[in-house]
């Protein structure tokens, strides 16, 4: 079955195969660059996330795409929808801020240096009856360092592809295989 | 794999057909965007927008994708093999 | 465009650019709608009782119970790209230790324009407790009603509907009858 492909490879020549590989690498590298660049602009480790749970329904459903920012100068406010990741938990959670408590820095030195207040937060999913205390894995409050970003923009359904790929891993491998083959065998 | 691909009917169309398909899909899609946006905005209903856009996309793919006879009216006329048979000696 | 596969490929590439343009246009069109409706908020009563919460089951602490009245017409916030409104009532105060507190005590999701004429006489949905466990010596708090418009496509907007004119003081804690 693969004799045809090997023949095609021979015909294209070594240089051509290298060129295709280089093209492939460029595509991957530019994707990574855009992602990391966005991360720097928004100050968020992952500026675009896919909603994985239904706890914010009817606002966000599984598969919706969220755009995040995490401005350094801004404190979070109640009503903001945040994405946070508790150390030890595998997936980030998208929930709304229910309470904030800005504790002023302790000691006169820190106060004079103008250190920002450290913020304690409590979150809750719109679709949940109780707050997120149980999700915090023993922490009493959510802090700034746990937060990935604040939801600014919203695009429905687009992220469902990634959920489908997670639920059906075969799909992922099939897609990767087909894309790779096409990239290598394309004759322009 | 290419054997496998070749066994599936490919629905080929000729060059004039390709140009026609290209023009049709550009015009239809861009007008669909403009019209569905304006209609949705005027009626203040986003479902109108996506309904119109989806319907026009479905219609477009029905017109453009299958190899209808109208895309195959200009078959390429190859020259006879006879005249090219002689090779010039250099 | 030669075979059906390349036609599918080309048309779907064009389709995705067009869809992107359409979504961007919808998101940008939201800029036209900048209604900022106002309403009335009145705090009817505040009581402070000792109580327990799930969070601190064993500590003795005060819980505040707030009764409030809200009237607001939020129909102007519903335009073609509004998926839902999230309304929330929050208390803001700075306690004796200088901690600035914002606590949401009530919220509501409004999904239809027909339900956007709000007229609520309610009490707090969520536990309202102080970080120091007591409302003794806590300065009066301001209450404000805010909204968050969530779109079908695009960015989220926030605003304030009403705010108490004067801060409302917390009463002394009284034993529950």
Swiss-Prot record, chain A:
Membrane topology value: Single-pass type II membrane protein
Residue stretches spanning the membrane: 21-41
Catalytic residues, chain numbering: 55, 95, 132
Main location: endoplasmic reticulum
Keywords, in A-Z order: Endoplasmic reticulum, Hydrolase, Membrane, Protease, Signal-anchor, Transmembrane, Transmembrane helix
Topology Lumenal: residue spans: 42-188
Gene Ontology biological-process entries: signal peptide processing
Compartment annotation: Endoplasmic reticulum membrane
GO MF terms held by the record: serine-type endopeptidase activity
Residues in the Cytoplasmic compartment per record: 1-20
Region (C-terminal short (CTS) helix): 174-185
Enzyme class name: hydrolase
Catalytically driven reaction(s): Cleavage of hydrophobic, N-terminal signal or leader sequences from secreted and periplasmic proteins
Gene Ontology cellular component annotations, sorted alphabetically: signal peptidase complex
The family this protein is said to belong to: Belongs to the peptidase S26B family.
Subunit structure: Component of the signal peptidase complex (SPC) composed of a catalytic subunit SEC11 and three accessory subunits SPC1, SPC2 and SPC3. The complex induces a local thinning of the ER membrane which is used to measure the length of the signal peptide (SP) h-region of protein substrates. This ensures the selectivity of the complex towards h-regions shorter than 18-20 amino acids. SPC associates with the translocon complex.
General function of this protein: Catalytic component of the signal peptidase complex (SPC) which catalyzes the cleavage of N-terminal signal sequences from nascent proteins as they are translocated into the lumen of the endoplasmic reticulum. Specifically cleaves N-terminal signal peptides that contain a hydrophobic alpha-helix (h-region) shorter than 18-20 amino acids.
Domain free text: The C-terminal short (CTS) helix is essential for catalytic activity. It may be accommodated as a transmembrane helix in the thinned membrane environment of the complex, similarly to the signal peptide in the complex substrates.
Protein name (database record): Signal peptidase complex catalytic subunit SEC11
Native source organism of the sequence: Laccaria bicolor (strain S238N-H82 / ATCC MYA-4686) (Bicoloured deceiver)
Gene: SEC11
């Amino acid at each position: 079955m693969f004799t045809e492909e090997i023949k095609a490879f021979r015909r294209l020549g070594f240089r051509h195969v290298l060129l295709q590989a280089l093209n492939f690498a460029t595509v991957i590298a530019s994707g990574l660059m855009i992602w990391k660049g966005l991360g720097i602009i928004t100050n968020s480790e992952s500026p675009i996330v896919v909603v994985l749970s239904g706890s914010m329904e009817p606002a966000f459903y599984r598969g919706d795409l969220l755009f995040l920012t995490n401005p350094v100068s801004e404190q979070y406010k109640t009503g903001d929808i945040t994405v946070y990741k508790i150390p030890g938990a595998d997936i980030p959670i998208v929930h709304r801020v229910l309470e904030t408590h800005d504790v002023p820095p302790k000691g006169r030195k820190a106060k004079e240096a103008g250190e920002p207040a450290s913020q304690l937060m409590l979150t809750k999913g719109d679709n949940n009856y109780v707050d997120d205390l149980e999700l915090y894995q023993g922490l009493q409050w959510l802090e700034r360092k746990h937060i990935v970003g604040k939801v600014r923009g919203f695009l429905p359904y687009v992220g469902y592809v990634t959920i489908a790929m997670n639920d059906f891993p075969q799909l992922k491998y099939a897609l990767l295989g087909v894309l790779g083959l096409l990239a290598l065998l394309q004759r322009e | 794999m290419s054997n496998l691909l070749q066994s599936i009917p490919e629905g080929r169309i000729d060059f004039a057909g390709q140009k026609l398909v290209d023009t049709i899909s550009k015009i239809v899609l861009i007008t669909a965007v403009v019209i569905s946006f304006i209609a949705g905005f005027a009626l203040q209903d986003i479902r109108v927008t996506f309904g119109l856009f989806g319907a026009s996309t479905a219609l477009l793919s029905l017109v453009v994708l299958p190899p209808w006879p109208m895309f195959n009216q200009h078959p390429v006329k190859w020259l006879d093999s006879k005249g090219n048979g002689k090779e010039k000696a250099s | 465009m030669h075979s059906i596969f390349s036609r599918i490929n080309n048309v779907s590439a064009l389709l995705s650019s067009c869809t992107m343009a359409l979504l961007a246009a919808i998101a940008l069109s939201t800029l036209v709608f900048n209604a900022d409706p106002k309403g009335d908020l009145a705090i009817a009563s505040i009581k402070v009782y000792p109580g327990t919460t799930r969070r601190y089951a064993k500590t003795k602490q005060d819980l505040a119970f707030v009764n409030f009245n809200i009237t607001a017409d939020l129909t102007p916030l519903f335009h073609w790209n509004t998926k839902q409104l999230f309304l929330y009532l929050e208390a803001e105060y700075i306690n004796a230790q200088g901690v600035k507190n914002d606590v949401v005590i009530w919220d509501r999701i409004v999904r239809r324009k027909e339900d956007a004429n709000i007229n609520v006489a309610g009490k707090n949905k969520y536990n309202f407790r102080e970080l120091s466990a007591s409302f003794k010596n806590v300065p009066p708090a301001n209450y404000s009603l805010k909204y968050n418009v969530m779109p079908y496509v695009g960015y989220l907007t926030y605003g304030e509907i009403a705010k108490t004119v004067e801060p409302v003081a917390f009463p002394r804690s009284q034993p529950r009858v």
